[in-house]
């Protein structure tokens, strides 16, 4: 929320020059603050893992649920606000919950047309350097004891302004943006997709959906109350209580499997890890590795896990996929400068790891994976 305030205050003058009918600075600021606060309100237990393993069955994700909550259950609270930390709104002003719902996620909302001033501000919430990732990357690095290169958040904010109908970054800040993207990539590869975390993901995947079925009666859009009460801690509390269920029952079995995971008694072992070539065909990698090791492996299970880090996600507000760069030498917004900046960084970096449930077969699986993935 604090970074949203800093962005709002910094771009205010240029926003009003481009959109004279924009609402008061306080209302714009609080709209962005709420979007920063609530953009992940739709997450279930274990964040994006819940999206992949549970919500995908209904064709939705946490952003769909978050927008539903903002426009529904939270709408009255949002409409009741009359000030930001900086100032009170103008008389008669209030935040439209749909503004918050629209600006906090990438995709458009069918049938909804946001005001032009809000559309211009969307890259502050959805882009390569947002109030979200500018906050969590340095914070997570600090909490994990990782020393990143300098992340000059204030420089990025200082050189951000509205030009035409979108957010623009002055060329003087391209170095700061590039350093931030490099730090973000490092965190994804070394922390968010760490091999230990992926072992936990594989282990939980075997029981996660089955566990959630016991706690959530159906689609969260139809059971908002139950969904809002479901979080990491309520799940842990439930599976701990299931240890008292009768032996042999489904809940007792799930409780015992969760107990092993919590104790780090994980059934998956890392056998091989590589960053593949950009042109590598990974579509049938698991099948090829399984065939290569089948002669000596017996009944061993193999999982090929592809962890992906996108450092420049598609930004629907610009054709280039990145923030537009203002070139002071020409006085124009240069899309070519954006392409030049992006070309310096991996656009789609992958780490491929091969896991097996047999510690005795680690070497055989390693050699098979190497022969397949390096060929």
Each predicted region: which residue ranges?
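Terminal helices and disordered tails flanking the catalytic cores of nucleotide-processing hydrolases
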Residues: 205, 215-375
């Amino acid at each position: 929320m604090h970074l949203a305030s800093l962005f709002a205050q910094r771009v205010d003058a240029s926003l009003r020059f481009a959109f004279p009918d924009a609402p008061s600075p306080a209302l714009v600021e609080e709209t962005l603050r709420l979007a920063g606060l609530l953009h992940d309100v739709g997450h279930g237990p274990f964040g994006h893992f819940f999206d992949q393993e549970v919500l995908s069955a209904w064709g939705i994700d946490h952003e769909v649920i978050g927008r539903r909550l903002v426009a529904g259950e939270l709408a009255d609270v949002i409409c009741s606000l009359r000030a930001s930390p900086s100032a009170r709104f103008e008389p008669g002003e209030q935040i439209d919950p749909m503004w918050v719902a629209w600006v906090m996620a990438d995709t458009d909302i069918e049938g909804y047309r946001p005001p032009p001033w809000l559309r211009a501000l969307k890259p502050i919430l959805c882009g390569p350097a947002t109030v979200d990732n500018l906050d969590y990357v340095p914070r997570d690095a600090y909490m994990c004891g990782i020393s990143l290169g300098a992340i000059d958040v204030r420089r990025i904010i200082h050189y951000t302004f509205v030009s035409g109908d979108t957010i623009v970054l002055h060329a003087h800040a391209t170095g700061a943006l590039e350093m931030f993207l490099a730090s973000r990539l490092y965190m994804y590869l070394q922390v968010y997709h760490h091999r230990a975390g992926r072992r936990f993901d594989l282990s939980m995947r075997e029981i996660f959906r089955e566990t959630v079925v016991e706690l959530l009666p159906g689609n969260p859009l139809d059971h908002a109350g139950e969904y809002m009460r479901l979080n990491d801690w309520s799940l842990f509390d439930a599976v701990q209580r299931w240890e008292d269920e009768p032996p042999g029952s489904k809940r007792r079995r799930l409780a015992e499997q969760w107990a092993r995971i919590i104790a780090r008694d994980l059934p998956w072992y890392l056998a091989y890890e590589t960053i593949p070539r950009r042109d590598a065909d990974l579509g049938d990698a698991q099948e090829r590795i399984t065939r290569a090791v089948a002669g000596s492996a017996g009944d061993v299970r193999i999982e090929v896990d592809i962890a992906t880090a996108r450092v420049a996600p598609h930004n629907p507000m610009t054709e280039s996929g990145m923030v537009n760069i203002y070139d002071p030498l020409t006085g124009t917004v240069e899309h070519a400068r954006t392409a030049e900046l992006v070309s310096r960084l991996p656009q789609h970096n992958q780490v491929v790891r091969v896991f097996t449930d047999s510690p005795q077969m680690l070497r055989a699986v390693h050699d098979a994976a190497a022969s397949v993935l390096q060929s």
